[in-house]
Amino acid sequence: MGQLISFFGEIPTILQEALNIALIAVSIIATIKGVVNVWKSGLIQLLMFVMLAGRSCSVQIGHHLELEHIILNSSSILPFTPTLCKLNKTYFLVRGPFQAHWGVDLAIGSTTVAVENATKTYTLKSKNFTGCFEGNPDPDSAALLVTWLFNSLHHDYKNDPSILCERVSGENSFRFQINISEPEYCEKILSRMANLFGSFENYCLNNRHIKKLIIIRNLTWSQQCHENHMSAMQLITSNIHTQVVRARRILSFFTWSLSDAVGNDMPGGYCLEKWMLIASQLKCFGNTAVAKCNLNHDSEFCDMLRLFDFNRKAIETLQNKTRSQLNIAINAINSLISDNLLMKNRVKELMDIPFCNYTKFWYVNHTKLNHHSLPRCWLVKNGSYLNESEFRNDWLLESDHLISEILSREYEERQGRTPLSLVDVCFWSTLFYTASIFLHLIRIPTHRHIVGEGCPKPHRLRADSTCACGLYKQKRRPLKWVRSN
């Protein structure tokens, strides 16, 4: 009795504390709801836009998903092959192999420098350049470079106009003169030069000069222009067709041995080292992203990774600058490059369509799980990279694919940790529960009642309205089926 009286005496205190709890709960709910309403009103978004306008362009696709990019260091891809560049619409340069200190220039004009049948002038009717490089300190490399160049221009020694070769005495220099005055031959040569060096003005349409010539001379290389790795790749793929069958496929022997920056095996992914990138120390991609390169050969990024890996090994072995070793390297590199992709991108450039320059690549990154999509090329148009909004559909679709891959991987991992018997038990128990719901809705009757009377339980009536114990003796009374509550 005393405890009951004490309880009633403490009720005001309990109510006061309960009221405090209610006030706190109401305050929290009101604050959260107020913040949500302010966010939905757009005021915060407006302030963020005003503060970040012109300062930030980060693209956040969704929750934990962001659009990021890497820029590959193209200068370290092919140091042992000839590299090409363009100064202007009529002047082009080609650097010798193995980062040579010499090269050749190609100048389009109308000035004649070599005359047929003159002293020290040779007419080339085959690929025999004997006499053109007398006195040159490295005649084999010079002959190889000129051979590659003429092969890339698709010059036919039998049917096309003859090429004149002149050796300048006392200067260890040489000159080649190509007459492109014939319209068809001019279009052919300049179109091939456009494939090699990139787009430039069509000199064949210049009617001010009847005679049109291309002069090729050797020179000392002093970094006159920035070498284009895409042009070097084009030079390689255009020369391989002279050695193997034209229809070919990328070799499938090149499978990824995933490693870290030091070269140790790392099953977790593949890392791009510092020398491969610009403005970044190290970038790693997971197995799922990089392993796609083993399945499909339709990615510019995969081509670049193959070249990086090949370059890392080739520098150690290709120290002897011989023609045979260089041809072996060219064959091996060509088996790693997709010439279809390369040609498509060059054609797109010539047609002023956004194309890939094999330098900048974008990918979708899941910041929480650190999963990446396979990088895709950031296209270029009119000398500048496209804005993110111009290929919005591409990275949104890539983000959907990345989320699907993450969910699929999590599902497979979860399946691997879950016993199959437990899955069966869960399935059949769920099926049983679903069936029981339908049985409950049907409301199956459980016993008989005599119409107009109460429940006869525990007696169980027969079909003739009697029971076994004799309490219900009258037969053939009306019955009905009833469900127990």
UniProtKB/Swiss-Prot annotation:
Signal peptide: none annotated. Residues 2-17, 59-424 are extracellular. Zn(2+) 1 binds at residues 57, 459, 467, 469. One of its GO terms (cellular component) is host cell plasma membrane. InterPro entries: Arena_glycoprot (IPR001535), Arena_glycoprot_zinc-bd (IPR043015). A lipid is attached at residue 2 (N-myristoyl glycine). This is Pre-glycoprotein polyprotein GP complex. The lineage of its organism: Viruses, Riboviria, Orthornavirae, Negarnaviricota, Polyploviricotina.
